[in-house]
């Protein structure tokens, strides 16, 4: 649950997570438009040539760091964004690189860390 509270011209954001160790999103965006790269803060000059974006979210959020390492070592992906506070991970590569990175992530966290994982989805 996200809540935004305003107090004397200050904004405070409250994020709450449900207890558990889980990957809640593992998605491949194949052939995304260049605008999507820009809106995500990725450099289309570098990242667009590979033509796929991988997105994951995880709790506990610090696991995103481990997931980034696994994806980089398992395939030729380029790291786009890691947020250890929200558990978001974005990376780019060819469709097969992104697929291999996501599969390696899910296999590791499921088998070694005993996380609950979701299926990989693709658009």
Give residue ranges: language-model regions:
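Positively charged, small/polar-rich N-terminal and surface patches that mediate targeting and assembly
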Residues: 1-68, 72-85, 92-123
